[in-house]
Amino acid sequence: MRVDLFDFDLPPERIALRPVEPRDASRLLVVRPDSGDMTDHGMRELPDFLRAGDVLVVNDTRVIPARLHGFRSRGESRAKIEATLHKREGEALWRAFVKPAKKLRVGETICFARQEPGTEVESLEAEVLEKGAEGEVVLGFNRAGAALDAALDLLGEMPLPPYIAGKRAPDSQDSLDYQTLFANRSGAVAAPTASLHFTPRLIAAIEARGVTICKVTLHVGAGTFLPVKAEDTDAHRMHAEWGEVSAEVAAFLNKVHAAGGRIIAAGTTSLRLLESAVDEDGLIQPFQGETSIFMTPGFRFRAVDILLTNFHLPRSTLFMLVCAFAGLETMRRAYAHAIAASYRFYSYGDACLLFRATRNTSTGAAL
């Protein structure tokens, strides 16, 4: 399909730079493609659209402070380096985007440290093991596993998306705001943002409806923010991300479907993982590994019935995903409504609850 079909104009003031407080005070647009219904609600009303026997699947990945500031030394000269980790390759290995990258050489060491008033914390070092295109390198750190994670927590910054970081610097509040209540397994460099709306109060209300909450893991990579540069979706190559669906969770989800319950994915990351794990017969299998699944209109969804998600960028793979799930025409209308009604967009913005389209809704007029 032509990528320009997924383009739309978004006023800059619709981009949320901070989340609402409390988290469940965000707005919720409910979209039912088959009936054409589109209604405005609040996030606290989410339980009203769920029923006993349903299951809500959340992503328990934890965002690491993946943006590091340091320097490389060459003789007596020093050059500042910024590195954004985006994919773990081993206990002490990470792929990263660095800048400036042009003069950085394989074999050089980058020293990362945070300067505190009157002191300098213990530094972290990484050797450049490989150098690729567009500023990508492989870094080998002098710490591994939990010790490396602890150093990143101390020295790193939250890797805010470019549409936020381009307008303000990350701060200590982002360390709280850009982490979900379900965060447990470290490895993501972007938050599964649909779950940022949950509070203990909202979780309790959902469980009181007889809805079970299940956890899966997908370590969200920086590729989630990469623009689609191709003119046709067939020419786009999707980034890979590591995920896991345990045998216990897979068996439970299949049991829910067999009993007539619905699977609600909290976020596109949960949906992408479940649709990577499902077989041709609609049974979800245990899964552990990388997925580069790419969904555009015409994709056949087998696992997920309802999707909770934020509002996404134009021409992005995530907007293509929601168009595949609920229909292109439906989502173009929904986004036009959201813009006109002053919904807040992107990671810190509002949410929409999408019921899966069961008929062909893949064509539509301009937004």
Curated annotation (Swiss-Prot):
The keyword Cytoplasm applies. Its EC number is 2.4.99.17. It is an enzyme of class 2 (transferase). The keyword Transferase applies. It holds the Pfam family Queuosine_synth. It catalyses: 7-aminomethyl-7-carbaguanosine(34) in tRNA + S-adenosyl-L-methionine = epoxyqueuosine(34) in tRNA + adenine + L-methionine + 2 H(+). One of its GO terms (cellular component) is cytoplasm. It is found in: Cytoplasm. One of its GO terms (molecular function) is S-adenosylmethionine:tRNA ribosyltransferase-isomerase activity. It comes from the Bacteria. One of its GO terms (biological process) is queuosine biosynthetic process. InterPro entries: QueA, QueA_dom1, QueA_dom2, QueA_sf. HAMAP family: QueA. Belongs to the QueA family. Monomer. This is S-adenosylmethionine:tRNA ribosyltransferase-isomerase. It comes from Beijerinckia indica subsp. indica (strain ATCC 9039 / DSM 1715 / NCIMB 8712). The gene is queA.
